[in-house]
């Protein structure tokens, strides 16, 4: 049977003539400059920032000449996550993570901006004059002077937007617009409505009932009449799902038809710039006509009042009259799904207090006008008069979370779609000047997923070559350490824990090569002072100096006489037998009030052979921790022991300092859980300050993990040294502290924006996924909430 439908080729109707120097030229001599737009990430923008973005759009649009069309086009395409399994060095758990997210659907957002210079006649053409309806298109010539002025205005437009610091424009090249042999271009993608890389040109069917592109059926909802708009528009709106009575989550006014609409769709936003003065003069004339006809009809009188209000607004505030149009073009290859999509689009428009208008008549011409570079073909009857400020309120202003452009990082998950993200919170922020160190401060109440997140982070750092030293108080890392030990055949994954049968044992005087640098000697001296003095005792310069001299003399002794076994026992014997005699024979006597060696020996007796704690500093195993990449010190059973806890902590810190100094060019990570409380003693204050300020110079980072805010407040040393020198702050669910969060906010120096983000954690979690949310703030300037979601295999590793 013969097809009686009218047919034509795309080539005959194609409205574009050429793309030269990155400019799209139509057959009607309209010239278009195309940009890719980089918008801020979803849930990370405040009301004030939305107003700033809005102000920049308005300012930029005003630099364009008359008879221009600003066409902002947001693409939202459903895609499936493709796991990265091709890397050779991936661990079993990393592969499990990738497989867990295999083919997970998500909505990919791309935003483009087309600035088109047309003519007065073209700007007022109606749909029946569209290039889609004309039999022949006769090319016209471009005016050189007009083109030059327009391109200069486009450069100003780009500069204004980029100077905002919130939105970034990047001009598209010719290859990106038309494509190459190996990659499809923007125009090809539009005609196929397919994701990037999958493009094949499709037949386009225009009928009275529907429009089809290949197998896809289109549905179009338009905002083309002022009566369809809400009574009031704004730059942003409150997102109730993630807001509390103490915090606001803000989204752009048009966000319901953006990322929150989970179907394949394109959101087109048009601002058509006419001669504002001429437009206002026409309205003045129309108002006079309405006035003269008001006696015949009340509607004429009402219309005159509306026109007067519009004119008064324009003249009072110096506003520019423009025309605008907005439409949501959605599609599906399934008829039933399309019905649901129509309902979804309608309900999302209704949530903006707009009147949903399903447009079936103008679908082909509006689709045609939305071709990149063909905005001048827009039918004038589909637009309504407004001002720039109101029109821009209906722009979408946010996008998906972005991956970090860095080879190093951890895998987190987009909280909206559940798509895995590559996130660098150590190196890239320092490179960009967002942070000045890699240190991190982690705060999360019990049950908030703190250990869950830390296990996830630590494993990935270790797999990327980092040396990790952990001080734990709850067996949180036992499973991970055991897995590493089994995988390396016992070569790595050292787990120290205290039991009565096998207590923790160290040897601070042991080194493989008998090399003791200044830091090593200082750490031994600090350890000995801690053994000797209580927290309340003040250490004098004489005591510190004499003990330092004794340590240096003992080290010289063991270096020259290798028959002496380095240990606390032999050091104690050296102090008791040799150093005490040398002290007594000096010409300048050292008074007991200045340095009481007998008191020191008596106090330290319990750590010497036969004493209560003779096991602690006299280990015979002599494990070289320098080469071990994953070390866990589990000290839960001694955390309340005032004798052992500070000593063990100092030894651990000394081990990390040794790594920090001697391992050049290797990432080092010290993670201290609740054990950090012991570091706040008077003897350790300077040591702590030194480590936190110095670790960044040695490619290292210190991470403190706690669940109690009060502990931080009570320690000025911790407050000053840890918080002030941790540019990366990580907070988990704080809703149980909501009523006293102002105190946390003041302590951590959080902004209102960061407070709102933190209080939104876990408020709107997807019940079909198992995950916990976490807030990560970098340098007080960049922050977002991410999801920690892992595979079943990773869950099984945890104890």
Positions of PLM-derived features:
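Short glycine/proline-enriched loop/turn "hinge" motifs that connect secondary-structure elements
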Residues: 23-29, 102-107, 316-321, 413-415, ...
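P-loop NTPase motor domains
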Residues: 47-63, 258-262, 271, 354-355, ...
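Conserved P-loop NTPase
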Residues: 752-799
């Amino acid at each position: 049977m013969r097809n009686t439908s009218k047919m034509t080729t795309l080539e005959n109707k194609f409205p574009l003539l050429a793309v030269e120097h990155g400019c799209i030229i139509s057959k009607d001599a309209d010239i278009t400059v195309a940009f890719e737009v980089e918008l801020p990430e979803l849930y990370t923008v405040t009301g004030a920032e939305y107003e700033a973005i809005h102000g920049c759009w308005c300012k930029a649009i005003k630099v364009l000449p008359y008879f221009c069309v600003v066409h902002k086009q947001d693409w939202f395409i459903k895609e499936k996550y493709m796991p990265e399994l091709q890397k050779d060095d991936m661990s079993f758990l990393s592969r499990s993570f990738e497989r867990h997210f295999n083919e997970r659907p998500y909505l990919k957002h791309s935003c483009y901006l087309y600035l088109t210079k047309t003519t007065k006649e073209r700007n007022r053409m109606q749909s029946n004059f569209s290039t889609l309806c004309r039999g022949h298109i006769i090319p016209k010539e471009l005016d050189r002077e007009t083109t030059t002025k327009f391109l200069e205005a486009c450069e100003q437009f780009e500069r204004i937007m980029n100077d905002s610091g919130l939105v970034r424009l990047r001009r598209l090249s010719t290859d990106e617009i038309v494509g190459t042999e190996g990659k499809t271009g923007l125009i090809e993608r539009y005609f196929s409505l397919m994701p990037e890389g999958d493009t094949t040109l499709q037949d386009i069917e225009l009928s009275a009932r529907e429009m089809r592109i290949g197998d896809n059926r289109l549905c179009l909802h338009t905002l083309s009449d002022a009566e369809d708009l809400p009574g009031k528009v704004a730059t942003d709106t409150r997102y109730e799902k993630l807001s509390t009575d103490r915090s606001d989550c803000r989204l752009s006014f048009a966000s319901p038809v953006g990322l929150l609409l989970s179907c394949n769709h394109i959101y087109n936003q048009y601002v058509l710039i006419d001669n504002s003065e001429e437009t206002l003069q026409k309205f003045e004339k129309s108002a006079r006509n309405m006035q003269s006809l008001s006696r015949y009809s009340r509607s004429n009188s009402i219309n005159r009042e509306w026109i007067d209000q519009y004119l008064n607004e324009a003249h009072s505030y110096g506003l520019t009259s423009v025309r605008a149009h907005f439409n949501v073009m959605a599609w599906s290859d399934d008829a039933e799904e399309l019905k649901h999509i129509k309902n979804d689009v309608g309900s999302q428009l209704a949530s903006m207090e707009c009147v949903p208008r399903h447009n079936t008549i103008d679908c082909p011409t509006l689709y045609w006008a939305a071709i990149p570079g063909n905005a001048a073909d827009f039918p004038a009857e589909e637009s309504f008069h407004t001002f720039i400020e109101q029109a821009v309120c209906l722009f979408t202003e946010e996008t998906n979370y972005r991956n970090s452009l860095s080879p190093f990082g951890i895998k987190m998950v987009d909280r909206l779609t559940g798509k895995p993200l590559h996130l660098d919170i150590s190196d890239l922020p320092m490179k960009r000047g967002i942070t000045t160190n890699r240190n991190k401060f982690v705060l999360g109440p019990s049950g908030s997923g703190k250990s869950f997140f830390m296990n996830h982070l630590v494993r990935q750092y270790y797999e990327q070559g980092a040396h990790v030293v952990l001080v734990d108080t709850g067996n949180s890392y036992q499973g991970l350490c055991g897995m590493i030990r089994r995988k390396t055949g016992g070569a790595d994954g050292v787990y120290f824990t205290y039991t009565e049968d096998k207590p923790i044992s160290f040897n601070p005087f042991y080194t493989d090569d008998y090399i003791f640098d200044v830091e090593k000697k200082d750490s031994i001296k600090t350890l000995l002072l801690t053994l000797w003095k209580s927290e309340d005792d003040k250490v004098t310069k004489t005591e510190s100096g004499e003990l330092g001299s004794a340590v240096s003399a003992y080290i010289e002794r063991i270096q020259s006489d290798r028959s002496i076994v380095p240990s606390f026992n032999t050091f104690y014997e050296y102090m008791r037998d040799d150093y005490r005699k040398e002290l007594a024979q000096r010409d300048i006597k050292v008074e007991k009030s200045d340095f009481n060696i007998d008191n020191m020996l008596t106090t330290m007796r319990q750590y010497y052979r036969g004493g209560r704690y003779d096991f602690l500093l006299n280990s015979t195993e002599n494990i070289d921790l320098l080469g071990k990449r994953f070390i866990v010190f589990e000290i839960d059973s001694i955390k309340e022991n005032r004798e052992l806890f500070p000593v063990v902590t100092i030894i651990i810190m000394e081990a990390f300092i040794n790594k920090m100094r001697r391992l050049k060019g290797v990432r080092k990570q010290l993670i201290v859980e609740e054990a950090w409380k012991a570091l706040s003693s008077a003897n350790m204050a300077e040591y702590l300050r030194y480590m936190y300020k110095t670790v960044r110079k040695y490619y290292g980072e210190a991470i403190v993990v706690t669940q109690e805010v009060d502990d931080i407040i009570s320690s000025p040393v911790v407050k000053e040294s840890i918080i002030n020198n941790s540019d990366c702050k990580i907070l988990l669910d704080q809703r149980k502290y909501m009523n006293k969060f102002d105190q946390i906010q003041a302590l951590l120096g959080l902004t209102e924006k960061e407070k709102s983000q933190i209080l939104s954690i876990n408020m709107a979690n997807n019940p079909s996924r198992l995950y916990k949310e976490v807030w990560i703030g970098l340098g007080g300037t960049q922050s977002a909430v991410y999801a920690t979601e892992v595979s079943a295999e990773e869950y099984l590793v945890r104890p």
